[in-house]
Curated annotation (Swiss-Prot):
PANTHER family: NADH-UBIQUINONE OXIDOREDUCTASE CHAIN 4L, NADH-UBIQUINONE OXIDOREDUCTASE SUBUNIT ND4L. This is NADH-ubiquinone oxidoreductase chain 4L. It holds the Pfam family Oxidored_q2. The gene is MT-ND4L. Core subunit of respiratory chain NADH dehydrogenase (Complex I) which is composed of 45 different subunits. Belongs to the complex I subunit 4L family. Its EC number is 7.1.1.2. GO terms for biological process: ATP synthesis coupled electron transport. It is found in: Mitochondrion inner membrane. It catalyses: a ubiquinone + NADH + 5 H(+)(in) = a ubiquinol + NAD(+) + 4 H(+)(out).
Length: 98
């Protein structure tokens, strides 16, 4: 296994561990999710280029679109929670029920 794949997988797992450890604030959770999506995008792109998968070349772009949608929804939720409660704690998300 090439060294770059190990680095990208290590970046994914570090972001995942960060998501598990720093889950009290919504902003840190969103940053860890973005790190995970970025490492998955790079890994998918490298695999498509190195394995010559011409039919699946659109999969990394689709993943990037979903990452952008996830970031937009996460930031909108962060703005709504911080305007309503003044904090960005994840525990305030349970209070947003109708």
């Amino acid at each position: 296994m090439p060294f770059i794949y190990i680095n990208i997988l290590l970046a994914f797992f570090i972001s995942f561990i960060g998501l598990l450890m720093y889950r009290s604030h919504l902003m840190s959770s969103l940053l860890c999710l973005e790190g995970m999506m970025l490492s998955l995008y790079i890994l998918g792109t490298l695999l498509c280029l190195n394995m010559h998968f011409t039919l699946s070349a659109m999969i990394p772009m689709i993943l990037l679109v979903f990452a952008a949608c996830e970031a937009a929804v996460g930031l909108a939720l962060l703005v709504m929670v911080s305007n309503t409660y003044g904090l960005d704690h994840v525990q305030n998300l349970n209070l947003l029920q109708c």
